[in-house]
């Protein structure tokens, strides 16, 4: 029985040690930015035994027996409230208490039955509201969890999964191979392009775009094994918003008029979340934010949110019993007529390859803060 293997690590026996350099940095920054909310989030983030995994079932090799077992063990389906968009084909289960289910091994020719993920990472996917036949771009796709989730929601006419880092690209390819049947592979393209070049390479091509941007991954950073490298990451953290803004500008170019864009990160950092979105809103005249506060009300049973000061933004933080996040989901925007961006030039960065790879590597252990940004052109503005 698969769930018999679920075990929790004994209290105090962590697989990794906390990195004091990072924790001190976060204490200083997030106490200022989040106030009392940081204290509760800190307790969860520093205690891996409290972390939870949701179980996303693969509709292309559906695990009926596992689903029965999950019900028997007290798991429940995610998003039991009525979201405006929630496809019946998307089945995700979670437990109220920390349970661990073993991940499946990759076997060539055999599709996996489920994918383990932080439940908060489904919020950007649902925010895209993917429909059958649409063209969708996952700009920073590795390790592939959100691409897999998108394919559980609908059958796109074309799914472009892009990843700039070569090591993570191999991981992405393996993930897709493990979950997607051969007939569906014909509508999926995998590329290794610098995301900042995608808008010029594929202008106004996509109905939906997901930018799950490289960021300072809070959970991963807290358990950095090398204090010197951790200090170096902290010193370079201020460069990340430049990269994120450049990726967003490129994504906007790749979005067709009337399309939708979602921006997400896995950090609580205001500079990488709210400030990035504010810069885009102030410098791009062809986008408009969309109020997503209703999603927070609908999802409050499973997630804890803190205010971002922006109607188009949601910040998910972990707390006891709702250990999902951190994840910031911000901004729904609508895109305006083509070629109407403000004249303000985008920020530039020297050494493109060097600056891009660093945050990609930091992002490798993503466990969930996301900020979402959604963009539409006024041609299909829905009030």
Model-derived features with residue positions:
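Glycine-rich nucleotide cofactor-binding entry segment
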Residues: 3-153, 160-182, 187-202, 241, ...
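Helix N-cap motif at beta-to-alpha junctions
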Residues: 59-62, 223, 353
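Structural detector for hydrophobic anchor residues on beta-strands
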Residues: 122, 160, 218-219, 327, ...
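Short glycine-centered segments of the SAM/dcSAM-binding site in methyltransferase folds
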Residues: 135, 158, 258-260
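Mobile active-site "lid"/loop adjacent to the S-adenosyl-L-methionine
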Residues: 154, 191-193, 201-250, 254-258, ...
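Residue-level signal for beta-strand positions within conserved beta-sheet cores that form or flank
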Residues: 155, 184-186, 285, 342
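C-terminal catalytic and target-recognition region of SAM-dependent MTase-like enzymes
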Residues: 262, 266-360, 368, 373-383
